[in-house]
Swiss-Prot record:
Reported function: Binds opioids in the presence of acidic lipids; probably involved in cell contact.
Disulfide bonds: 57-115, 157-202, 244-296
PANTHER family per record: IGLON FAMILY OF IMMUNOGLOBULIN SUPERFAMILY-RELATED, OPIOID-BINDING PROTEIN_CELL ADHESION MOLECULE
Tree of life domain: Eukaryota
High-level lineage: Eukaryota, Metazoa, Chordata, Craniata, Vertebrata
Organism encoding this protein: Homo sapiens (Human)
Similarity field: Belongs to the immunoglobulin superfamily. IgLON family.
Name the record gives this protein: Opioid-binding protein/cell adhesion molecule
């Protein structure tokens, strides 16, 4: 804001006005807020970015001249506008009040503003400080990330605002009330576990407006483990189903074996069906030769695991090792090579 807006005035008029203002606000005059001889001290004005700020100066009939300044820049002198900023307008100029408005306030408008008056040939001033508040805004946040279990992870969330916002990280994929993680721009997780996967929420708050919230997803890879594998009893001629459930990220791939033979859909009236975490081996018409131990193998890029499941008939004793036909299944997996040995004893 400056005096250049009146360069279109005749130069003589400009000189006269300049001299009058020099007389009005002489160099070295101290700022006095709350002076007993000044009509009224002014409180600080606080507005949000984008709103309008009204600066009010209470005066009386002793005032002969009055002006508003921003630091050393003249905005208005009486009804004469010196600022070239179209956002600055005069609201009231009466014997009791002299007020201006700054529209669409921005952060660079923040600072001291001075109301200067001339009374009884003595200049007096009162200062008001304009405070501009800015809602919180997250400017930079980490992207979604995939890591292996046991790795270290650092998430970043940078936010701006006035006052400076408080940044909080929270894990959303846990029970309510247990999701608080940290109150910092950086979230560091060492030796990450599979139950620490999921969405993490960054919230920036400064009480000026609603918090700015962004989310980051962490995917934790881990090798398979079989969570459900149950022996099944069924009579000859009936339908029998063996099921095998495995948790893994990425999703596990399943294979079924009986002794040293890898099974496939269509082999001897069997069907293998894989759906997500579950794999089933279905016998549509169980015969005596179908009874025995079967091995479910779950594999992903981080490792493998297996479980032995028994299909048995009526009267069979199953206690983990069949008393009629004890067996030990051993599996070695390396890359895509899988060797299967079935040892009876």
């Amino acid at each position: 804001m400056g005096v250049c807006g009146y360069l279109f005035l005749p130069w003589k008029c400009l000189v006269v006005v300049s001299l009058r203002l020099l007389f009005l606000v002489p160099t070295g005059v101290p700022v006095r807020s709350g002076d007993a001889t000044f009509p009224k001290a002014m409180d600080n004005v606080t507005v949000r970015q984008g709103e309008s700020a009204t600066l009010r100066c209470t005066i009386d009939d002793r005032v002969t001249r009055v002006a508003w300044l921003n630091r050393s820049t003249i905005l208005y002198a009486g009804n004469d506008k010196w600022s070239i900023d179209p956002r600055v307008i005069i609201l009231v100029n009466t014997p009791t009040q002299y007020s201006i408005m700054i529209q669409n306030v921005d952060v660079y408008d923040e600072g001291p503003y001075t109301c200067s008056v001339q009374t009884d040939n003595h200049p007096k001033t009162s200062r008001v400080h304009l405070i501009v508040q800015v809602p919180p805004q997250i400017m930079n946040i980490s992207s979604d990330i995939t890591v292996n279990e046991g790795s270290s992870v650092t998430l970043l969330c940078l936010a701006i605002g006035r006052p400076e916002p408080t940044v909080t990280w929270r894990h959303l994929s846990v029970k309510e009330g247990q999701g608080f993680v940290s109150e910092d721009e950086y979230l560091e997780i060492s030796d990450i576990k599979r139950d620490q996967s999921g969405e993490y929420e960054c919230s920036a708050l400064n009480d000026v407006a609603a918090p700015d919230v962004r989310k980051v997803k962490i995917t934790v890879n881990y090798p398979p483990y079989i969570s459900k594998a149950k022996n099944t009893g069924v009579s000859v001629g009936q339908k029998g189903i063996l099921s095998c459930e495995a948790s893994a990220v990425p999703m596990a791939e399943f294979q079924w074996f009986k002794e040293e033979t890898r099974l496939a859909t269509g082999l001897d009236g069997m069907r293998i069906e894989n759906k997500g975490r579950m794999s089933t081996l279905t016998f549509f018409n169980v015969s005596e030769k179908d009874y025995g131990n079967y091995t479910c193998v779950a594999t992903n890029k981080l490792g493998n695991t297996n479980a032995s499941i028994t299909l048995y008939g009526p009267g069979a004793v199953i206690d983990g090792v069949n008393s009629a036909s004890r067996a030990l299944a051993c599996l070695w997996l390396s890359g895509t090579l899988l060797a299967h040995f079935f040892i009876k004893f």
